[in-house]
């Protein structure tokens, strides 16, 4: 028997959020196995400390077969300021 809440064929995602709170120019990069739930947590002040008190929209996500792949890409995206800037600019169009 599979315990409740256990995902089968689970995928992981690296994602980027853009703050839509007026006057705030912030982005956030993370990883998750449930994009909708994670975005809901960020927007209900139950997400990462740096996202609390702001409203967020999902502007980018990339799907992976393993948690390690998603975490590795998250690290790279967090440190690639050029790519983050391009993704933010693309989201403004």
Predicted regions and their residues:
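GIY-YIG nuclease catalytic motif and its immediate N-terminal context
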Residues: 1-50, 54-57, 61-83, 89-93
């Amino acid at each position: 028997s599979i315990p409740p809440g256990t995902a089968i064929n689970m995928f992981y995602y690296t994602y980027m959020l853009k703050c839509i709170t007026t006057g705030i120019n912030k982005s956030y990069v993370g990883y998750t196995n449930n994009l909708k739930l994670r975005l809901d947590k960020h927007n209900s002040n139950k997400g990462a400390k740096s996202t609390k008190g702001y409203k967020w929209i999902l502007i980018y996500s990339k799907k992976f077969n393993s948690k390690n792949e998603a975490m590795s890409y998250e690290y790279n995206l967090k440190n690639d300021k050029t790519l983050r800037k391009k993704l933010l600019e693309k989201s403004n169009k």
